[in-house]
From Swiss-Prot:
<feature type="disulfide bond">
    <location>
        <begin position="78"/>
        <end position="120"/>
    </location>
</feature>
<feature type="disulfide bond">
    <location>
        <begin position="71"/>
        <end position="127"/>
    </location>
</feature>
<feature type="binding site">
    <location>
        <position position="76"/>
    </location>
    <ligand>
        <name>Ca(2+)</name>
    </ligand>
</feature>
<keyword id="KW-0638">Presynaptic neurotoxin</keyword>
<keyword id="KW-0479">Metal-binding</keyword>
<feature type="disulfide bond">
    <location>
        <begin position="56"/>
        <end position="72"/>
    </location>
</feature>
<dbReference type="InterPro" id="IPR001211">
    <property type="entry name" value="PLipase_A2"/>
</dbReference>
<feature type="binding site">
    <location>
        <position position="59"/>
    </location>
    <ligand>
        <name>Ca(2+)</name>
    </ligand>
</feature>
<feature type="disulfide bond">
    <location>
        <begin position="88"/>
        <end position="113"/>
    </location>
</feature>
<keyword id="KW-0528">Neurotoxin</keyword>
<dbReference type="GO" id="GO:0005509">
    <property type="term" value="F:calcium ion binding"/>
</dbReference>
<keyword id="KW-0800">Toxin</keyword>
<feature type="binding site">
    <location>
        <position position="57"/>
    </location>
    <ligand>
        <name>Ca(2+)</name>
    </ligand>
</feature>
<comment type="similarity">
    <text>Belongs to the phospholipase A2 family. Group I subfamily. D49 sub-subfamily.</text>
</comment>
<dbReference type="GO" id="GO:0005576">
    <property type="term" value="C:extracellular region"/>
</dbReference>
<feature type="disulfide bond">
    <location>
        <begin position="54"/>
        <end position="146"/>
    </location>
</feature>
<comment type="function">
    <text>Snake venom phospholipase A2 (PLA2) that shows presynaptic neurotoxicity. The A chain has phospholipase activity. PLA2 catalyzes the calcium-dependent hydrolysis of the 2-acyl groups in 3-sn-phosphoglycerides.</text>
</comment>
Amino acid sequence: MNPAHLLVLSAVCVSLLGAANIPPHPLNLKNFMEMIRYTIPCEKTWGEYADYGCYCGAGGSGRPIDALDRCCYVHDNCYGDAETKHKCNPKTQSYSYKLTKRTIICYGAAGTCGRIVCDCDRTAALCFGDSEYIERHKNIDTKRHCQ
């Protein structure tokens, strides 16, 4: 084998070994982020929705503080129903969808885990696009506001 080829092959193997220790983002999270980016105003990033209100982000408690937070509350409950009623794993479930003409189309047979999770994400992303983003509700003190 040519020494140059051996060097390239070694570099590829080393990089693959390093990449094996990097946990992948669940495919569904990537899909959901893409849906959000498609529906929200251009000046916002999907990350600005990750720690908003009482329900946007990890966990959730109390009453939603506004319409946007209610979108996250409904999304959390939708995922909960997908897990308990349909035995789906929403965070890792793959699904097919299309972004077109300012809407989102979910594919797959009704009642399948892929379709159920896609519908949860679609509904939330469209809700985000229709709801006002209130800056003071970002990074709120959840112990104080979300009881």
